[in-house]
Amino acid sequence: AVLIMSAEKAAELGMKPRAKFHSFALAGTDPVTMLKGPIPATKKILEKTGLSIDDIDVFEVNEAFASVVLAWQKETGADMSKVNVNGGAIALGHPLGASGTKLMATLLNELERTGGKYGLQVMCEGGGMANATIIERLD
């Protein structure tokens, strides 16, 4: 599960935040080549934040087909040892309406396990659109 609230509300409830949202981006491609959406979404969020692909410690790239991740990696140059390290949607499933939550939980758990700082989640959302989110693990 993912629980989202302000830092103020977390303090009020005596809860310790595990991560914060660093940035969001949305991008689209020609619907005919819709499986390429994560590529411009990733480029857009990195440009927006000033981070480089090498600044990201863990990637969760949702895929319905293996070619999505391979095309994404070829274009971004991401280190594949940091991509879907616990298995992607092909191995673990692609839950309808819950992919984002699954990816976010996996991403944060892996950042905590490895001591990483930044995690990037990127996924297609249909019709050529894709979204990207960078989270920052808090100590």
Regions found by a protein language model. Give the residues of each.
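Short glycine/threonine-rich loop-to-helix capping motif typified by GTGT followed
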Residues: 31-38, 63-81, 95-99, 131-138
